[in-house]
């Protein structure tokens, strides 16, 4: 089994991907991230930009929760994919 590896010093187009993070309010924030960078970096940057806490929101991709250690490569994300953000629901009792 031979794996195709890019030549050293040659940057591949596939090294970075652009991801969109869509909030419940319809806002969309774009991020450029390396395929093997943990998504926690994107999640923290989104929270800082929106003035939110990581405890207040949840990130989902294709309906599945995203863990901080997940990478775009692990989740098979492609360029221009969208991550959805949801407010954390708390309580339920009056």
Curated annotation (Swiss-Prot):
It holds the Pfam family Rad60-SLD. Residues 93-94 form a propeptide. There is a cross-link at residue 92 (Glycyl lysine isopeptide (Gly-Lys) (interchain with K-? in acceptor proteins)). It is found in: Cytoplasm; Nucleus, PML body. GO terms for biological process: protein sumoylation. Disulfide bonds: none annotated. Residues 15-92 form the Ubiquitin-like domain. GO terms for cellular component: cytoplasm; nucleus; PML body. Polymeric chains can be formed through Lys-11 cross-linking. GO terms for molecular function: protein tag activity; ubiquitin-like protein ligase binding. There is a cross-link at residue 11 (Glycyl lysine isopeptide (Lys-Gly) (interchain with G-Cter in SUMO)). Keywords: Cytoplasm, Isopeptide bond, Nucleus, Ubl conjugation, Ubl conjugation pathway. Interacts with SAE2 and UBE2I. Covalently attached to a number of proteins. Ubiquitin-like protein which can be covalently attached to target lysines either as a monomer or as a lysine-linked polymer. Does not seem to be involved in protein degradation and may function as an antagonist of ubiquitin in the degradation process. Plays a role in a number of cellular processes such as nuclear transport, DNA replication and repair, mitosis and signal transduction. Covalent attachment to its substrates requires prior activation by the E1 complex SAE1-SAE2 and linkage to the E2 enzyme UBE2I. Belongs to the ubiquitin family. SUMO subfamily. This is Small ubiquitin-related modifier 3. It comes from Gallus gallus. The lineage of its organism: Eukaryota, Metazoa, Chordata, Craniata, Vertebrata.
């Amino acid at each position: 089994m031979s794996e195709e590896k890019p030549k050293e010093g040659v940057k591949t187009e596939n090294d970075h991907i652009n991801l969109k993070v869509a909030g419940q309010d319809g806002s969309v924030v774009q991020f450029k991230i390396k395929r093997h960078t943990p998504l926690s970096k994107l999640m923290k940057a989104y929270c800082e930009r929106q003035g939110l806490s990581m405890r207040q929101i949840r990130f989902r991709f294709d309906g599945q929760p995203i863990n901080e250690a997940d990478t775009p490569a692990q989740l098979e994300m492609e360029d221009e994919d969208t991550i959805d953000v949801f407010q954390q629901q708390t309580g339920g009792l009056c």
